Amino acid sequence: MNESSAATRMGLAVVAISTALVVTALAVVPFLNPVWVSFEQGRTGVTALTGWSAPEVRTATDAILHDLIVGPPDFVVTVSRFEVLTDAERAHMRDVRGVFAGFFAVGTLAIAVLLGSFWLSGKGRQGWTRRHAWRGVRLGAAGLVLGTVAAGVVALVAFDAAFEVFHRLFFTSGTYRFDPATSKLVQLFPDAFWSETAVAVGALIVVLAGATAWIAGRRGRATAVAGSAAGGSATGAATRRISEPEPVK
């Protein structure tokens, strides 16, 4: 493998990974809003679990979401002078906020990488072309579809195990397990809430990634056709110049 080929393969991998990160981040954002959270809490019977009225559930949830997304991450929430979260739960939510912040920081970097890859493809340096850039996007999006479907199958078969593995990857052991009978955090966001939200996020990822792969495939083919046409025109012009006899002086 020559140096140019290795660089192209590396570029394809970087673009593919960046595409997967950006699509995933875009799919997560809609589910961080109070409208979805309220809808899903209604479906999973949060008022019955907490023993609170719907307005009280909304007050507590909105405060938690505000500290999670906007900050500061104090997570000091009260309902009828009752402190909703314990010290351990507040510490866990600060950890959650740190994971989200890191994820979206990486997503922002991935956007910059994609923009840079397309800018470089316009320069045609190191053999990196616009066709390569679109191919990387298509590979990343298609791979994300396959990965999401596979993860979805695993989650449907063993959601609790998948949930545990996910938490072990990002959180210290023992900091994220709370008693559903007494923990308001678990009652506000029960397992059914997370399982249904995970399905919705996964479905949106598949839709966005599938559309991205389709668009990237079309753009890549169009770029290849345009490049071939331009190359053919240039070759034809050169042939005509060679075949034309020089004028007699």
Task: Report the location of each language-model feature.
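Individual transmembrane alpha-helix segments
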Residues: 69-109, 191-201
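Hydrophobic alpha-helical membrane-insertion segments
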Residues: 19-29, 54-62, 139-164
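Actinobacteria-biased recognition of intrinsically disordered, low-complexity terminal regions
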Residues: 1-8, 220-249
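Terminal transmembrane helical module of multi-pass membrane proteins
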Residues: 174-227, 246-249
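Membrane-interface interhelical loops and short interface/amphipathic helices
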Residues: 38-83
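Juxtamembrane interface at the cytosolic side of transmembrane helices
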Residues: 111-159, 211-227
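Juxtamembrane non-transmembrane "cap" segments at the membrane-aqueous interface
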Residues: 154-180
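Hydrophobic secretory-pathway targeting helix
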Residues: 1-37
